[in-house]
């Protein structure tokens, strides 16, 4: 493969026409087999060319903001990067809570991850030089001691911007315990904080039990007696750290949840059993509610046990006969009805016994209903047959429908009505003729009697 470099080398001819005029050209081409050009200024792919791909070592953790002295000039590049915007511009009036004053007032040695993008081209030489110095200072015996604290480091003033000479000594200690000495700013400062307004915080030890404060507050402790006191909520106890100068801030969501759950368990009262009894005419109904004193927020194993018991004094029967009285008839109203029936009917035994038998023997009532229904069907069928035969007879008596066997019932009734009117008119006419004939008969009888007398 052949190497094609950029502006660091003199202009060379690139065999790839597509990449010849590119601003940044690749160093290798996969379609060429030679290792390097045969030009006079070409460099074989050894250690020199691999330095272009050298990755800078991982930058150390952010230096502590507690190593501040009464100096106006930063000692090294780390102090410059740790200074806030107001300190870099030299404005003492504009103080931010993220500056040395704000952080100093919260904790003596806060270790906050500021920025891990320190591998820029402008800071490359400074980073290499600083790393070598830090490693040299780390091997010295005096550098292993604890970091010193300045009494006035927590005060929000422009005088507290510098760093002491022990800043380099504290860095290896921080590198030795990266997990316990560094926290994410997003965890500590969840909400935007306004300037010059201290936030109420809670202090928690590095390895203390999970009794932390609610998530969202900056957790720290005063650096010196001269620093401003930070208000802590009642009911929260501060414990000294187990060891070391730095304190790990505990702001886990699980710790806050367990703290709130424990407080609720301490405050809540035990509820044994609540029993509510309601008396009805049909029978007593008892509701039993059992509440467990455990809190339900910890999981399914601590859920409240609730029991609902419903008792009825009147048994429920399967009702098939919809015409029969309901089994839920009040027992108090039943005796007056029996008395009324006894007063009205002379033989009340049957009327009293049958409803009782129906209500307490559903099988017997079902059999009686089936017999009654069967008898009703037989009678209905017989009635229909009689009606059909009557229409057939009526049709046979009407002269117009004698030969019409498929005549409808309406036609049969209509023709029969007309025929009845015709017969009535015919009868009236015949009666008139009968009367005339009877009168003529009387006259003829009188004439015969007169003839016999002469």
From Swiss-Prot:
One of its GO terms (molecular function) is protein dimerization activity. GO terms for cellular component: nucleus. CDD domains: bHLHzip_N-Myc_like. Residues 151-161 have a biased composition (Low complexity). Transmembrane segments: none annotated. Residues 371-423 form the bHLH domain. The keyword DNA-binding applies. Keywords: DNA-binding, Nucleus, Proto-oncogene. Residues 363-374 have a biased composition (Basic and acidic residues). It is found in: Nucleus. Residues 256-269 have a biased composition (Acidic residues). The keyword Hydrolase does not apply. InterPro entries: bHLH_dom (IPR011598), HLH_DNA-bd_sf (IPR036638), Myc_transcription_factors (IPR050433), Tscrpt_reg_Myc (IPR002418), Tscrpt_reg_Myc_N (IPR012682). Residues 132-166, 230-269, 325-374 are annotated as: Disordered. Residues 423-444 are annotated as: Leucine-zipper. Efficient DNA binding requires dimerization with another bHLH protein. It is linked to N-MYC2 proto-oncogene protein is overexpressed in liver tumors. N-MYC2 is totally silent in normal liver and is probably a retroposon. WHV virus activates N-MYC2 by integration. This is N-myc 2 proto-oncogene protein. It comes from Marmota monax (Woodchuck).
């Amino acid at each position: 493969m052949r190497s094609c470099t950029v502006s660091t080398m003199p202009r060379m001819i690139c065999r790839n026409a597509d990449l010849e005029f590119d601003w940044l050209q690749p160093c290798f081409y996969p379609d060429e087999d030679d290792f390097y050009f045969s030009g006079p200024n070409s460099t074989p792919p050894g250690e020199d060319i691999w330095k272009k791909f050298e990755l800078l070592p991982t930058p150390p953790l952010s230096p502590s903001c507690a190593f501040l002295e009464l100096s106006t000039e930063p000692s090294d590049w780390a102090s410059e990067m740790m200074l806030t915007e107001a300190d870099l511009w030299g404005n003492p009036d504009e103080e931010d809570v993220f500056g040395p004053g704000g952080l100093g007032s919260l904790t003596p040695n806060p270790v906050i991850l500021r920025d891990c993008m320190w591998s820029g081209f402008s800071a490359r030489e400074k980073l290499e030089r600083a790393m070598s110095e830090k490693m040299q200072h780390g091997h010295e015996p005096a550098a292993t001691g604890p970091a010193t604290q300045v009494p006035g480091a927590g005060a929000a003033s422009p005088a507290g911007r510098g760093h002491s000479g022990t800043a380099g000594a504290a860095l290896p200690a921080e590198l030795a315990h990266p997990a316990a000495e560094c926290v994410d700013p997003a965890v500590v400062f969840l909400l935007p904080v306004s300037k010059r307004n201290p936030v109420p915080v809670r202090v928690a030890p590095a390895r203390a039990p999970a009794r932390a404060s609610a998530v969202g507050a900056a957790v720290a402790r005063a650096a010196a007696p001269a620093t401003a006191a930070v208000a802590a909520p009642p009911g929260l106890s501060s414990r000294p750290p187990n060891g070391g100068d730095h304190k790990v801030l505990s702001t886990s969501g699980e710790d806050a949840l367990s703290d709130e759950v424990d407080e609720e368990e301490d405050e809540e009262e035990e509820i044994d059993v609540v029993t509510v009894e309601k008396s009805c005419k049909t029978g007593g109904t008892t509701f039993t509610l059992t509440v467990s004193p455990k809190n339900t927020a910890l999981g399914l194993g601590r859920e409240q046990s609730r029991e609902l018991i419903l008792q009825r004094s009147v048994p429920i029967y399967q009702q098939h006969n919809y015409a029969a009285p309901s089994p839920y008839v009040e027992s108090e109203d039943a005796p007056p009805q029996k008395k009324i029936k006894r007063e009205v009917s002379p033989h009340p035994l049957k009327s009293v016994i049958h409803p009782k038998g129906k209500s307490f023997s559903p099988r017997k009532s079902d059999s009686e209903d089936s017999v009654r229904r069967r008898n009703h069907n037989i009678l209905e069928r017989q009635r229909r047959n009689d009606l059909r035969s009557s229409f057939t007879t009526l049709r046979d008596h009407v002269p117009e429908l004698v030969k019409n066997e498929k005549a409808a019932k309406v036609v049969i009734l209509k023709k029969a009505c007309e025929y009845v009117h015709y017969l009535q008119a015919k009868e009236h006419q015949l009666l008139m003729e009968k009367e005339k004939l009877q009168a003529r008969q009387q006259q003829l009888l009188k004439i015969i009697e007169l003839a016999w007398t002469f």
